[in-house]
């Protein structure tokens, strides 16, 4: 069966204490209540890095630059109606204080506590890679 391929870029924001920022999917969206790495859909003509710069500003009110985004790994996961490809970047340098601009809860989480936050199936395999990095 042929499924649409959806390209989404995600970012593991890491603070000075080595914690990772998670955002909770708001009510009314698919997978509501689950925690995820901030990011969003790559629009036509946009690179994943451009997507993250835009989405981090829109969703969290923070600014970063392409040079501050380091590609780490990616997720490839088949959902019922589409296949998700999601590069995950790490960002340690950004300006501003993250806050949920779209009504979503956010939380800084120690790497060893990431498993305590229910995540979408595509995000779950990324946790081990991040724990190994930090």
Model-derived features: where do they sit?
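A short coil-to-beta-strand element that immediately follows conserved catalytic motifs
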Residues: 63-73
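Active-site-adjacent beta-strand/loop module that shapes the phosphate/pyrophosphate-binding cleft
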Residues: 6, 15, 73-97, 107
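Generic C-terminal helix-cap and adjacent flexible tail
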Residues: 1-3, 131-134
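Conserved N-terminal beta-strand and adjoining loop/helix that marks the start
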Residues: 1-20, 41
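NUDIX/MutT-family hydrolases
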Residues: 88-90, 98-130
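Conserved Nudix-box catalytic region and its N-terminal flanking loop in Nudix hydrolases
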Residues: 19-58
